[in-house]
Amino acid sequence: MMNALELQALRRIFDMTIEECTIYITQDNNSATWQRWEAGDIPISPEIIARLKEMKVRRQRRINAIVDKINNRIGNNTMRYFPDLSSFQSIYTEGDFIEWKIYQSVAAELFAHDLERLC
């Protein structure tokens, strides 16, 4: 189960517009439905809840892995921040839009807590 506020929060954590969510998460380009979910007018599709929860899990795994490296003093506590998808894919050639958004969300979170510097 997920409510409208949780849906909005996750969209914002991943820095995605409603339009991007309808392209890359629902894959139906139906902004009106997403807006109705965020307004609490209709129940959120279980498939969409599952996709968002999986994105959240992947994000947390990345955060945990980086924090473990920091705690073990591996690396220099600097993380790349990619301004666009093409720059992300130049390094992570198998990465897609969703992977980029997860990566960026992790980078921003760790930077906000002074755990990583961005480069």
What does each model-identified segment do?
Residues 8, 19-20:
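Residues within the helices of the helix-turn-helix
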Residues 20, 44-62:
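DNA major-groove recognition helix of helix-turn-helix/homeodomain DNA-binding modules
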Residues 61-119:
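Helix-turn-helix/homeodomain-like alpha-helical modules used for DNA recognition
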Residues 5, 15-17, 29:
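Residue-level signal for the short linker/turn that defines the boundary of a DNA-recognition helix
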Residues 1-13:
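A short, Lys/Arg-rich alpha-helix, primarily the initiator
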Residues 11, 22-23:
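The alpha-helix within a helix-turn-helix
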Residues 26-44:
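Recognition helix of helix-turn-helix/homeodomain-like DNA-binding domains
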